[in-house]
Amino acid sequence: MASEAPPFWWEEPDWKVLALSPLSAVYALVAGRVMRRARREKIEAPVLCVGNFTVGGTGKTPVAIALAQQAKRMQLKPGFLSRGHGGSFAEPHVVDAHHDAAKHVGDEPLLLAEHAPVAVTPNRAAGARLLMAKHGCDFLIMDDGFQSARIHIDYALIVVDARYGIGNGRVIPGGPLRAKIVDQLVFTSGLLKMGEGTAADAVVRQAARAGRPIFEARAEPISKAGLAGKRFLAFAGIGHPDKFFDTVREAGGEVVLSKPFPDHHFYAEDELAELAAVARAEGLGLITTAKDAARLRHGASQDFLNRLEVLEIDTVFELDHAPERIIEETLDAWRQRKLRS
């Protein structure tokens, strides 16, 4: 199931925002109350949540992967908790990166599963117990679920895209916010500003005034080799496809044609056939994101996959010690929780 944020969410407020204000006010009231009153189950392992304030992509999954890699360097055994966008399992399911399809577990869990065990379930606490019992995980990283998960979070790292910030600053449906910033900041442990830009400056200052530590990071291609001088038809079904197109250019590729699709889009045969035909006619290579490639593994022909280049992304923190600090502060909060119980 694909989703696409309305363009006006990322623009200056207009009449549409005004018309939706009553609904936004109701949504904000309910969302804030849910966050404040939710019963969150405490589990035996520390829980680090990588979330965001808004609907849409902010680069959480590469951040979660980077933190899992840091946890491994600290001799921990990380595991991921994910709802799994579009997933179809009623009970907690541990993802098999080689055999599971994105339509069953979601695209992001397939990427996460290449680095650590992943439990897909809306019941994060049940998923946590499964990972601890069957895989010996002793450090759990939750990809999303900041506002809704019914599990105690020891550290909530909120990722904000520097290019888009929090959009028009309004709550759903008038804007991209999942709840009022003041309500979300209460449960925020730290804020990570991703990339370059000034759109997030206001919320960064607000978080800093609230005493939350501010981290910075950027997304970098894992390998730029082979892209320089190549001409591409780039396509992507992610939160902000234009960010991907820019990354291809920054890596040395020439984006001659670009085709955006809705976030989490599952490609139909005729769409893939059209992409391949246009690329062939124009003498272009095909390039897409790792998330899109995960969705295509069980849906595209082998010929299409053989022609496709995938741009892998890594999260690079501005301060080398930042990931270690985040892990340590999660562990400290967990130890304090254990002492109080």
Curated annotation (Swiss-Prot):
Reaction catalysis annotation: a lipid A disaccharide + ATP = a lipid IVA + ADP + H(+)
One Gene Ontology cellular component: plasma membrane
Pathway in which this enzyme or protein is active: Glycolipid biosynthesis; lipid IV(A) biosynthesis; lipid IV(A) from (3R)-3-hydroxytetradecanoyl-[acyl-carrier-protein] and UDP-N-acetyl-alpha-D-glucosamine: step 6/6
Pfam family, one: LpxK
Top-level division of the source organism's lineage: Bacteria
Protein family membership: Belongs to the LpxK family.
Entry protein name: Tetraacyldisaccharide 4'-kinase
Gene source species: Mesorhizobium japonicum (strain LMG 29417 / CECT 9101 / MAFF 303099) (Mesorhizobium loti (strain MAFF 303099))
